Amino acid sequence: MEIIIVVAVVALIAVFFISQYNRLIRLNITVDEAWAQIEVQLKRRADLIPNLVETVKGYAKHEQSTFDAVVTAREKATTASTVADTAAADGMLTQALRGLLAVAEAYPDLKASANFMSLQEELATTENKVAFSRQFYNDNVRSLNTAVKTIPSSFFAGFAKVSEREFYEVEDPQDRNVPNVSFN
């Protein structure tokens, strides 16, 4: 009888260890999948940018510095390797795209162009997908980080070779500036 109790306790402990280990592995895989989705959406956006730049260039030939800023930001965004680098490059690219779209506002013929409108619509859709992917990634990173930091799964994190992950945070300098309000 004692041997059955010992075997049952050992079996329960083994099941507990295995379930904690598998939970951490599943969370880690989910974070990897979420990161892959961000990369897919950022690639899609990067692929749209050359067409958008060429379309705007046809109407606004003297806006070379804006075009150069977009191309440079796109290059950095496509070569970033870490979460922090990707987030920084993404913020820079977003700023450059805002500049490009501001240039487009000055050209009514461009704004009326079917090609430009289609590209702008695709870009807006892609931006929404990027935002959703970022949120999905950060939600999964939060779940993983919580599991890695809390007992009992924190005891198994090292064994499972799972560690905390960085959140995807885009710092947009424009979001920090307080707008000037004048009632004059």
Residue ranges: model-predicted function:
Residues 1-184:
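A helix-centric hydrophobic-segment signal that preferentially recognizes long
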